[in-house]
Curated annotation (Swiss-Prot):
Descriptive protein name: Acid shock protein
Compartment(s): Periplasm
Gene name of the encoded protein: asr
Functional description taken from the UniProt entry: Required for growth and/or survival at acidic conditions.
Source organism (scientific name): Enterobacter cloacae
Family: Belongs to the Asr family.
Propeptide residue interval(s): 22-59
Pfam family for this entry, one: Asr
Amino acid sequence: MKKVLALVVAAAMGLSSAAFAAETTATAAPAASTAAPAKTVHHKKHHKAAKPAAEQKAQAAKKHHKKAAKPAVEQKAQAAKKHHKKAAKHEAAKPAAQPAA
């Protein structure tokens, strides 16, 4: 009952929940004091190997690779670029097939 009252009072005062956890585990700790304390393991941070300094470039030069220059093509009208005309059929040049009489 006292723990509940302490939690309500502490919540009203605006204390963090981490403080509550510390208080509640501190009261249960004497019962578990017979267990061996856990070893603290220090983890080593992995450091990346230093790369040689690259030549500094403009930001656009890094991202955009220029294509090989093509020889200049003769300028055409816009319609001529888009529409390819099919070869015109000349019907008049051929004599009409006459039915066999």
